[in-house]
Structure formats: structure tokens, C-alpha cells
């Protein structure tokens, strides 16, 4: 699933190419693409037609288009393989095209989704701590690249939990936008094993992890995000290349860039974690062991 840098790359592309345009028509080509919009396809198409796209916004991994003159946003769920492509209408239809919106600018906004886990849905905007967000996103915490992200407050929240530090990083109600890739990269930079317990880490250590997450995601942004296959692309269909700069994630058995020790892969929350056993020694007591 795309993480903050990948979603931000898409947001910036949408901001550049479609903000200010109005929607002339909408074609729903697959029912699963609008399953989160409970009133159905005709309602979604009807509400979008004639609306002007005022802005492209994001919080963490969540992306939405603010519409005018209403107080409604089009929430875009990218899922595992969703793509928001801006294309000239004469280009051939993509094999997995699910929704097509024709804009008055002469361009198409196309939602392509091979695995059909993503989709579009309308949601009312609500005020949360001085920011307007879709009500479906209201429970999501600010992300590390948000100008109003409160690092000190987030450190306090993390340390107030009794859980593994990686699990806390992945909790979108604590800090949003960080997924498996950037959690592993941030922990590697901070030299902390993901199974370390949050209430046993010092404030400076938690701050170091969160700062590392900020740094690695900013670097990923400059390289268009991380693409491991053709499913993640920007609005022009181009892949990112930060995967070439990863130090831990996906690097099993390769030498740690810092000390040369082979990177190790471990199971964590039905996924894999990657770390250096020398730079990031595992804790003697994990959460599972301490609860026995």
C-alpha cells in the first residue's frame, strides 16, 4: 500500500494538473470502485458532475479532492494498486480502468486499479483541530510532514503506550503516513529494534525515531517515492526510484550500509520487518514474552 511519500507525489501531481478544473462527466466502470459510496454509482456521478476541484489535500496516506461550492470532498482510496492518472482523452483506455472523469480542461482523470481494493467516495468535510478533513479521516493523526505536526506531543503519546515501537509507528491514530517501508527505515537510522517497548524508550530516543521518519520520507519525496512494481506510479504513469536508496527494508541478507552485518528479516504483524542485528539489537523481553 502506498505510504505518505507516494501519496504526496500523487497529490502534488493532481494539484498541478487538475485543481481549478470542473468535472464535465463521470463514468463508473466497475462497481467495486464505488463500494464505499453507499448511495451508489449514479449518486456519485451526479454529485461530481459540474463540481469544481478546489484543492488536492492529504493527511498521512489519505488523499482527497475538495470540491466547490459544496462542503464535500472526494476521498480517494488507493488501496494496494490504485492509480490516479491524468491523461488526454484520446489515449487508449487502460486495462484496469475503473472510473473516468472528464474535465473541462480537456483532460481525463482516470482511476485505474488492478486489484480493486481502492475506490472513490464522497464525504462531508469536518473541522478537526482547525483543519477541514473528510469525516472518514477525522480519526487520523497528523503526519510527520504536516506543518502543524506536534513532535513533542507525539513523543508523549508514543511513550504513554505499552507496545512495540514499530507497532506504534504503524498506528495511524498516533502518527499517520508511516507504513512498513518507512518504519523499518526510520528504526534503522535510529538504531532501534522494532520490538523495543515504547514505555521503555527515553523521550530523546522516541524523538530520534520520529525525526528519522521525517527525514527518510522527505528524501523519498525527492525521488518520487518507492516503487517495487508497476502498480505504484505518479499521475503521469512514472515510477519512483527511492527503492534504490533503502538501507533496511527488503534488504534481507545484504550487508548493512553502516556496519556490514547481513540484514535480517523477521515476522511482525503478518508482515516482514527488516533490521540489522548488530546496529539494532533485539530486546531481551518482547511484548509477547512480557505478557506471559
Swiss-Prot record:
Cytoplasm in keyword set: no
Cofactor binding remark: Binds 1 zinc ion per subunit.
GO molecular-function term, one example from the UniProt record: class I DNA-(apurinic or apyrimidinic site) endonuclease activity
Gene3D superfamilies per UniProt: 1.10.8.50, MutM-like, N-terminal
PROSITE patterns on file: FPG_CAT (PS51068), ZF_FPG_2 (PS51066)
Keyword line: DNA damage, DNA repair, DNA-binding, Glycosidase, Hydrolase, Lyase, Metal-binding, Multifunctional enzyme, Zinc, Zinc-finger
Highest taxon of the lineage: Bacteria
Transmembrane region(s): none
BP-aspect Gene Ontology terms: base-excision repair
Residue positions binding DNA: 96, 115, 161
FPG-type zinc finger segments: 247-281
Reactions catalysed according to its record: Hydrolysis of DNA containing ring-opened 7-methylguanine residues, releasing 2,6-diamino-4-hydroxy-5-(N-methyl)formamidopyrimidine; 2'-deoxyribonucleotide-(2'-deoxyribose 5'-phosphate)-2'-deoxyribonucleotide-DNA = a 3'-end 2'-deoxyribonucleotide-(2,3-dehydro-2,3-deoxyribose 5'-phosphate)-DNA + a 5'-end 5'-phospho-2'-deoxyribonucleoside-DNA + H(+)
Enzyme Commission designation: 3.2.2.23, 4.2.99.18
Keyword Zinc-finger: yes
Cofactor(s) demanded: Zn(2+)
Active site: 2-3, 61, 271
SUPFAM superfamilies: Glucocorticoid receptor-like (DNA-binding domain) (SSF57716), N-terminal domain of MutM-like DNA repair proteins (SSF81624), S13-like H2TH domain (SSF46946)
Assembly, per entry: Monomer.
Family label: Belongs to the FPG family.
Function: Involved in base excision repair of DNA damaged by oxidation or by mutagenic agents. Acts as a DNA glycosylase that recognizes and removes damaged bases. Has a preference for oxidized purines, such as 7,8-dihydro-8-oxoguanine (8-oxoG). Has AP (apurinic/apyrimidinic) lyase activity and introduces nicks in the DNA strand. Cleaves the DNA backbone by beta-delta elimination to generate a single-strand break at the site of the removed base with both 3'- and 5'-phosphates.
HAMAP family reported for this sequence: Fapy_DNA_glycosyl
PANTHER family found in the cross-reference section: FORMAMIDOPYRIMIDINE-DNA GLYCOSYLASE
NCBIfam families: fpg, PRK01103.1
Protein name, entry field: Formamidopyrimidine-DNA glycosylase
Source organism of the structure: Rhodococcus jostii (strain RHA1)
Species lineage: Bacteria, Bacillati, Actinomycetota, Actinomycetes, Mycobacteriales
Gene symbol of the encoding locus: mutM
Amino acid at each position: 500500500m502506498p505510504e505518505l511519500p507516494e501519496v504526496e507525489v500523487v497529490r502534488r501531481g493532481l494539484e498541478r494538473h487538475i485543481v481549478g478544473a470542473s468535472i464535465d462527466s463521470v463514468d463508473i466502470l466497475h462497481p467495486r470502485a464505488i463500494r464505499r459510496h453507499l448511495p451508489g454509482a449514479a449518486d456519485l456521478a451526479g454529485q461530481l458532475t459540474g463540481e469544481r476541484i478546489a484543492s488536492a489535500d492529504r493527511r498521512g496516506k489519505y488523499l482527497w479532492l475538495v470540491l466547490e461550492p459544496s462542503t464535500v470532498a472526494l476521498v480517494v482510496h488507493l488501496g494496494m494498486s490504485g492509480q490516479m492518472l491524468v491523461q488526454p482523452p484520446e489515449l487508449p483506455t487502460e486495462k484496469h480502468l475503473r472510473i473516468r472523469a472528464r474535465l473541462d480542461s480537456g483532460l481525463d482523470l482516470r482511476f485505474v486499479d488492478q486489484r480493486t481494493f481502492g475506490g472513490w467516495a464522497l464525504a462531508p468535510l469536518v473541522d478537526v483541530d482547525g483543519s477541514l478533513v473528510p469525516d472518514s479521516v477525522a480519526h487520523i493523526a497528523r503526519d510527520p510532514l504536516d506543518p502543524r505536526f506536534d513532535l513533542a506531543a507525539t513523543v508523549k503519546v508514543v511513550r504513554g503506550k505499552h507496545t512495540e515501537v514499530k507497532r506504534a509507528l504503524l498506528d495511524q491514530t498516533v502518527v499517520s503516513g508511516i507504513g512498513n517501508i518507512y518504519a523499518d527505515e526510520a528504526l534503522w537510522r535510529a538504531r532501534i529494534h522494532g520490538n523495543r517497548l515504547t514505555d521503555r524508550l527515553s523521550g530523546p530516543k522516541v524523538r530520534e525515531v520520529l525525526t528519522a521518519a521525517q527525514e527518510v520520507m522527505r528524501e523519498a519525496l525527492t525521488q518520487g517515492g518507492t516503487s517495487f512494481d508497476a502498480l505504484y506510479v505518479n499521475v503521469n504513469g512514472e515510477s519512483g526510484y527511492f527503492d534504490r536508496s533503502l538501507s533496511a527494508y527488503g534488504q534481507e541478507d545484504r550487508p548493512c550500509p553502516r556496519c556490514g552485518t547481513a540484514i535480517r528479516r523477521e515476522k511482525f504483524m503478518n508482515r516482514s520487518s527488516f533490521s540489522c542485528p548488530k546496529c539494532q539489537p533485539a530486546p531481551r523481553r518482547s511484548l509477547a514474552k512480557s505478557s506471559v
